[in-house]
Design a protein with these regions (language model features):
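Surface-exposed aromatic
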Residues: 212, 227-236
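Hydrophobic h-region of N-terminal signal peptides that target proteins for export
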Residues: 9-18
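Mixed-charge (Asp/Glu-Lys/Arg
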Residues: 164
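Compositionally biased alpha-helical segments
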Residues: 18-142, 149-160, 169, 175, ...
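TPR/TPR-like (Sel1-like) alpha-helical repeat modules
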Residues: 138-139, 210-217, 237-264
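Positively charged n-region of N-terminal signal peptides that target proteins for export
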Residues: 1-4
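Boundary/linker segments of alpha-helical solenoid repeat arrays
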Residues: 108-110, 142-150, 179-186, 218-228, ...
């Protein structure tokens, strides 16, 4: 890590502080936390954290490989935009999320925004644009295709566009990633992939056994349960209903509404 202390050199940064156009957060490396205005340089492929110290500005340059943690402040308007997507008002949030993807490049929220942008496009009936937004992220970070927040919506886009072979490869990678969230999300993706070929009784049962029901029964604790179980319970209920097991369907829906009443899946 390099540190530069020079008011003249950082005149542009000072102007940005005055205009308050910065992205704020904390990046931690072996030397400790660096808190201030954060930016990523595409030219040098490094992070910069600028902070005020007395009458000068101190800028720390940090290599990605040296970072132990990163915490970027949530963008203004984020919760409202997410709520619109979850309420089925996806089109109203497209411009917002597109702007966040661009502004927060390599600063955590770009991946999260790309996930909601793809979801918004998909909900608006535009899977091609959803694929475009996912592909832009995956091109820069190939691991995002099978691991992390973007992956599940990327898989839904691939299902919608009939790209089953590509999806199959990504699900295998996710299952082998060692990441519990990605492994669980891959099981839901597996169920979606099975049903993409048709909803016969055989395929509905396979989607349950190989996908949805495994998540509903095995991922029952912590944050991952909140992230994955609502969708798994909802889709399990749908499958049970379609194969004529109304009692099991009611059981799944009852558990969904009791444990996750605020989930969009509980309100469908």
């Amino acid at each position: 890590m390099k540190k530069i202390l020079a008011t003249a050199i950082l005149a542009v940064s000072a102007a940005m502080f005055a205009a308050d156009e910065n992205i704020y957060g904390t990046i931690t490396d072996a030397q400790g936390p660096h808190k201030g205005a954060v930016r990523y340089s595409m030219k040098s492929k490094t992070y910069f954290v600028t902070s005020k110290q007395g009458g000068a500005l101190l800028e720390a340059e940090i290599q990605p490989g040296d970072i132990t943690s990163m915490d970027i402040v949530e963008p203004a308007g984020w919760e409202q935009a997410v709520a619109k997507v979850e309420k089925g008002q996806a089109a109203a949030s497209i411009n917002y999320f597109a702007g966040i993807v661009k502004k927060y490049n390599h600063l955590q929220w770009d991946l999260r925004a790309a996930r909601y942008l793809a979801d918004a496009y998909l909900s608006s009936g535009n899977p091609d644009k959803a694929l475009e937004s996912c592909t832009a992220v995956v091109r820069a970070d190939p691991e995002a295709a099978y691991k992390g927040e973007l992956a599940p919506i990327f898989w839904k886009v691939l299902v919608k566009l009939g790209k089953k072979e590509q999806l199959e490869k990504l699900l295998v990678k996710a299952a082998a990633s060692g990441d519990r969230y990605s492994s669980g999300a891959a099981l839901i993706g597996r169920g979606d992939l099975i049903l993409a070929s048709g909803e016969s009784n055989e395929s509905l049962r396979a989607a349950l056994v190989e996908g949805y029901l495994r998540v509903a029964l095995m991922y029952t604790d912590g944050k991952i349960a909140e992230q994955l179980r609502p969708e798994a319970l909802a889709k399990s209920a749908q499958c049970f209903e379609k194969i004529g097991q109304a009692g099991r369907a009611d059981q799944m829906r009852g558990e969904l509404k009791r444990l996750y009443p605020n989930s969009p899946w509980a309100k469908q």
